[in-house]
Design a protein with these regions (language model features):
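N-terminal helix-rich module
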Residues: 1-14, 18-21, 30, 35-65, ...
Length: 199
């Protein structure tokens, strides 16, 4: 006995005082976690959407490079074309020259919330790139057997400019791919109302 109470009762009281968290502690922890999540979630969503846009631009650049390498390997003029499937724009390598998307041809399907942004009001002017004259991608880029851009009909030799952006989430800016007359691709990034910068 200790102070009129049995020893077992004292030990039991001590164990009860140490066990678990109080309801107030649990509620406060949850409240702090929810506040932190509500602050971080919009930034996380914006970052993911920015990565998606950059990824699509990189895939477009790779498809253009594949078109060029196909022209060199086949010793022929091969073109990158566009078509529409449902609500999405499709870029594809026209390997057989029939100007139609065939089942075996490499392609890039733009997500329905993205568009080819050439000529859009929020797309910065390509003159800020500092690469000289450019011409907008108008649905076709062709490469000859040397891997150079094939300007059909003796067109002006200038870099092609292909811009990609979101249809509604314009705050994420625009990405672009340029193709030099020699067939080299380069990726660009521009914030809304800003200037183009190489990636």
């Amino acid at each position: 006995m200790c102070g009129g109470r049995p020893m077992k009762a004292i030990q039991k009281t001590r164990h009860c005082a140490k066990a678990g968290f109080s309801l107030v502690e649990v509620v406060m922890t949850l409240a702090i976690g929810m506040v932190l999540a509500s602050v971080a979630l919009p930034m996380l969503v914006t970052a993911v959407q920015g990565y998606r846009l950059t990824s699509i631009a990189q895939q477009a650049a790779h498809l253009i490079a594949l078109t060029r390498y196909s022209a060199i390997r086949r010793n022929a003029v091969i073109s990158l074309q566009t078509t529409t499937q449902g609500a999405s724009k499709v870029l594809y390598v026209d390997l057989n020259g029939n100007t139609r998307l065939d089942a075996s041809e490499p392609l890039l399907l733009l997500p329905p919330d993205m568009q080819i942004a050439n000529g859009q009001s929020l797309t910065p002017d390509p003159s800020s790139m500092g690469i000289g004259n450019t011409q907008n991608f108008a649905g076709r880029i062709a490469f000859d057997y040397r891997g150079a851009v094939n300007f059909a009909g003796g067109g002006v030799t200038s870099s092609y400019f292909l811009a990609i952006g979101y249809i509604s989430q314009t705050q994420l800016g625009t990405r672009a791919v340029t193709v030099s007359p020699l067939g080299q691709t380069r990726l660009w990034n521009a914030p809304v109302g800003g200037r183009w910068a190489g990636m």
